[in-house]
Amino acid sequence: MNKYEIIGIVGEGAYGVVYKAKCKETGDFGKLVRSFIFLVAIKKFKESDDDEIAKKTIMREVKMLRLLKYKNIVMLKEAFKRKGRLYLVFEYVEKNLLEVLEDNAVGIDPKRLRYFIYQIIKGVTFCHKNYVVHRDIKPENLLINPKDN
């Protein structure tokens, strides 16, 4: 955790908290240089040493994320354990599809919507080719970068 500076909380879920952070080593915000991302999302899991089911679920997620390297799937940068808790560091993506939909109360342009659907299908197809089923596809879990990817 020493190389990251927490900026704020992105969200909370059943297994833990997701933080927005910047990499201290770069001293920069949000610029992409040769696939190294300075802004990251850090998923901090609740203590799970007592809960065998939670541990198995978390380890399955880590294994799956290490396997799934694809442009339409958020990238896992690293995973580490500190003080009995697991941390997953992802590329940071600013918005999700739910936020995009809420920002466009009159609806999304059909061409843009087709582009979103096409990318979702590409990502899901890649998962299925790797024998992974998402099981929780919903607008807030579909991340959208500034280029609509």
Predicted regions located by residue number:
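AlphaC helix of the protein kinase catalytic domain
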Residues: 98-108
